[in-house]
């Protein structure tokens, strides 16, 4: 068992054990994640979703419910389909030549793959933060103001200023940049750039925020700040995060879904997934036997 897997095993309750394991796998609780007190309404519903890239099938009959105002983590080894599935939620796979998505994905009950859906509007409602920080080659202010401006969310300069300030505050960045808003966003540190990208997504008032390994390019201090931010944001947004770090999934999520070879193996409350998974593949992945 490598260090990361061992540390994950130390993040939960000592009275609960991974199925079939000895006391070696007993777990104690030290997560920063806020557990859910009660079930939440479903914000995104996926049913029998398949993804093809040309003749190659990358995802097989995936069905899942994503609750609102909670963090759902997608875990699994590289190439398992978790990022492919995440990109289905705001139709980013549409940008890949030869891709095809079948099945049904609903946002608030409406099929997002229906021909009447405005994809630009959809991507405002379901924002995305990528693995590598990608600020626009513009000022800090313009990085955040760009989306609200093109979507017509601000009718006056004062309105735009308020959106920029509020978004940067929600992203935990305002106090660090308020005196240099007109400096290039690319001049910020990596962690600050990622929080700027989160502020940019927030600025257009999304309902859902997708995060594809948002901390993989960050140092531990910047990662901790982003994880704390994720836990704060989930009070107002539905968040889905893809991560290779099971420590991160355990720290920030309320629900976890395990993928392997293009299939959804199982999903459920994060505490249960890490202490009493139903599937052996999940158990083996969490305990470091593969992946």
Curated annotation (Swiss-Prot):
Gene Ontology BP term (one): phosphate ion transmembrane transport
UniProt membrane topology term: Peripheral membrane protein
Keywords recorded for this protein, A-Z: ATP-binding, Cell inner membrane, Cell membrane, Membrane, Nucleotide-binding, Phosphate transport, Translocase, Transport
Keyword Cell inner membrane in record: yes
Ranges of residues in domain ABC transporter: 44-286
GO cellular component: plasma membrane
Matches recorded under Gene3D superfamilies: P-loop containing nucleotide triphosphate hydrolases
UniProt entry tagged with the keyword Nucleotide-binding: yes
Chain residues that bind ATP: 76-83
InterPro entries: AAA+_ATPase, ABC_transporter-like_ATP-bd, ABC_transporter-like_CS, P-loop_NTPase, PstB-like
SMART domains given in the database record: AAA
Compartments in which it is found: Cell inner membrane
Chief localisation class: membrane
Name of a matching Pfam family: ABC_tran
Molecular-function GO term, any one: ATP binding
Superkingdom of source: Bacteria
EC number: 7.3.2.1
Reactions it catalyzes: phosphate(out) + ATP + H2O = ADP + 2 phosphate(in) + H(+)
Record-linked PANTHER family: ABC TRANSPORTER I FAMILY MEMBER 17
Complex and partners: The complex is composed of two ATP-binding proteins (PstB), two transmembrane proteins (PstC and PstA) and a solute-binding protein (PstS).
Family, per entry: Belongs to the ABC transporter superfamily. Phosphate importer (TC 3.A.1.7) family.
Reported function: Part of the ABC transporter complex PstSACB involved in phosphate import. Responsible for energy coupling to the transport system.
Protein name: Phosphate import ATP-binding protein PstB
Organism annotation: Chelativorans sp. (strain BNC1)
Lineage: Bacteria, Pseudomonadati, Pseudomonadota, Alphaproteobacteria, Hyphomicrobiales
């Amino acid at each position: 068992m490598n260090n990361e897997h061992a540390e994950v095993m130390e993040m939960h309750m000592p009275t609960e054990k991974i199925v079939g394991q000895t006391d070696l796998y007993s777990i104690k609780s030290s997560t920063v994640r806020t557990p859910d007190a009660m079930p939440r309404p479903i914000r995104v519903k996926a049913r029998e979703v398949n993804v093809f890239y040309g003749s190659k099938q990358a995802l097989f009959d995936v069905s899942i419910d994503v609750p609102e105002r909670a963090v759902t983590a997608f875990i699994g080894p590289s190439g398992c389909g978790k990022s492919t599935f995440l990109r289905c939620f705001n139709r980013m796979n549409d940008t890949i030549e030869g891709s095809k998505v079948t099945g049904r994905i609903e946002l608030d009950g409406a099929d997002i793959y229906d021909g009447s859906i405005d994809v630009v509007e959809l991507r405002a409602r379901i924002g995305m933060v990528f693995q590598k920080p990608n600020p626009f080659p513009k000022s800090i202010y313009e990085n955040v103001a760009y989306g609200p401006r093109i979507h017509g969310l601000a009718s006056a300069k004062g309105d735009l200023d308020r959106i920029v300030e509020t978004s940067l505050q929600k992203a935990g960045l305002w106090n660090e940049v308020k005196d240099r808003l007109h400096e290039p966003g690319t001049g910020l540190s990596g962690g600050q750039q990622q929080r700027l990208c989160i502020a940019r997504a927030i600025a257009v008032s999304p309902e859902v925020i997708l995060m594809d390994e948002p901390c993989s390019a960050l140092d531990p201090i910047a990662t901790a700040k982003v994880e704390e931010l994720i836990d704060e944001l989930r009070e107002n947004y539905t968040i889905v995060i893809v991560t290779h770090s099971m420590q991160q999934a355990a720290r920030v999520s309320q629900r976890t879904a395990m993928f392997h070879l293009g299939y959804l193996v199982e999903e459920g409350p994060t505490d249960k997934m890490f202490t009493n998974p139903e599937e052996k593949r999940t158990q083996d992945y969490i305990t470091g036997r593969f992946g």
